Amino acid sequence: VLFVVSEGRFNFVNRIRAWEQKHNHGEKVQGFVLGDPVPLASEELQPFINGACCASPTDEYKLVVLDTVGRSMAGMNENSQQDASAFTSMVERIQRELNTTVLALHHTGHNVTNRARGSSVFGADADTIIRADRQGKDYLVSLTMTKQKDAPEWEKKKFIKLSGVSLDLETKSLVAVKPGEDECPKGDKFHP
């Protein structure tokens, strides 16, 4: 996995350590690479591709995560069809050149929470869209598939729970875990 962190990079190492502690018995996770530099839709992509190839011991990734779309579009306009198309073209090139799947994390708008903020190009060009919604003030998050181009959509919501992991006396991080069936809302049928 190549994870390109452009938002929250300072604390990302703590998130990795917490995940390792919770899901990997405290052992370092293998095959996980932090990407640098952040690919920008407005710049030449080849330095990112070359860096990704050099950083991988096997020259291949099963997944590339871009966190976030907004940061990968620095200096561009998310509402512009032309700029959004430049971003989705960049994603397609990363997919093609690294022979991988790309997960681009994007925020919803402040007033419209049922779709990604910015141009409708993001939704139109995406193969799959999964919306994450925090359920109230607890740490339960529902995952709703709103688009799936080449396979059946999920029939039901899926859920994850954010669990606090203490790394030391002062440092704590949240990690996604599978919730118990009794932790999911009664109106939604649990679907692991």
Question: Predicted regions: what is each one?
Answer:
Residues V1-N77, Q82, A86, R93, ...:
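Conserved inter-motif catalytic segment of the P-loop NTP-binding fold
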Residues N14, G70, A116, I130-D133, ...:
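Short, intrinsically disordered low-complexity segments
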Residues H23-H25, H106-H110, H191:
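Histidine (H) residue identity feature
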Residues L63, Q82-T171:
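Phosphate-binding/switch region of NTP-binding enzymes
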Residues C184-P192:
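Short amphipathic alpha-helical interface segments
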